[in-house]
Design a protein with these regions (language model features):
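Short Gly/Pro-enriched turn/cap motifs at secondary-structure boundaries
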Residues: 58-61, 90-92, 109, 145-152
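Structured core elements
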Residues: 51-53, 67-71, 78-80, 85-87, ...
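Internal helix-loop-helix
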Residues: 1-37, 41, 45-46, 94-98, ...
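Gly/Pro-rich turn-and-neighbor structural signature
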Residues: 27-71, 77-78, 84
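A short core secondary-structure module
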Residues: 76, 80-130
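Conserved small/polar residues in nucleotide/adenosyl-binding loops
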Residues: 183-185
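Long, acidic (Asp/Glu-rich), low-complexity accessory segments flanking structured domains
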Residues: 160-177
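Flexible, small-/acidic-enriched active-site or ligand-binding loops
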Residues: 130-157
């Protein structure tokens, strides 16, 4: 009931928590115990927020044609690509923004069966355990919209240098399934 009041009072602001709730659901559904321990307390406290990154400039809603790539360097997944229409993709309301990003791994089949979901934090953990290291991602621009103007909608770029460090959520090739569970379709 409280969400109904909140969304009715200010949908622009409420969208941030709505997306974060989707990430909570996704981590609860397919996250490892370590991922749940790392992310869920931060999401639940509001210290961190979350986004979902599906759409690309050349693909629109045809997710089978996304070009964002995920390459494993032996230690980490390195993500390179661009996403558009990312609600709350960049803001200063939380200590960290956790992006769930759809990307295609090397050698993956064409179409949606070759897409995986990656966890890409804006800030990575440093040697002391604090999240202070800036990941290789950036907001290219904030969209100019006719409505819901108080909700920043970003164009995000991943991996303009070495590649944004990402962590695969769940199993390889099940990215569409996980992302759709996030939005309850």
């Amino acid at each position: 009931a409280i969400n109904e009041y909140w969304h009715g009072a200010n949908m622009s602001f409420a969208l941030c928590s709505l997306l974060t709730q989707g990430l909570i659901d996704a981590f609860t559904l397919v996250g490892t115990e370590e991922e749940k321990k790392t992310y869920l307390p931060k999401f639940n406290s509001g210290a961190w927020t979350g986004t979902m990154n599906l759409t690309e400039p050349q693909s629109g809603t045809d997710l089978a044609t996304i070009k964002t790539k995920a390459e494993h360097d032996g230690e980490n997944w390195r993500i390179k690509g661009q996403k558009i229409y990312i609600t709350y993709g960049e803001h200063d309301m939380s200590e960290n923004i956790i992006h769930l990003v759809l990307a295609r791994t090397e050698g993956a089949p064409e179409g949606i069966k070759g897409i995986s979901t990656f966890i890409i934090p804006k800030f990575l953990k440093d040697e002391s355990g604090e999240y202070t290291i800036r990941n290789d991602l950036k907001c290219i621009s904030i969209e100019h919209k006719m409505g819901i103007k108080a909700s920043p909608t970003a164009v995000m770029s991943y991996g303009e240098n070495e590649g944004a460090i990402g962590y695969m959520l769940g199993e390889e090739g099940r990215g569409i399934e996980y992302m759709l569970s996030l939005i309850h379709i």
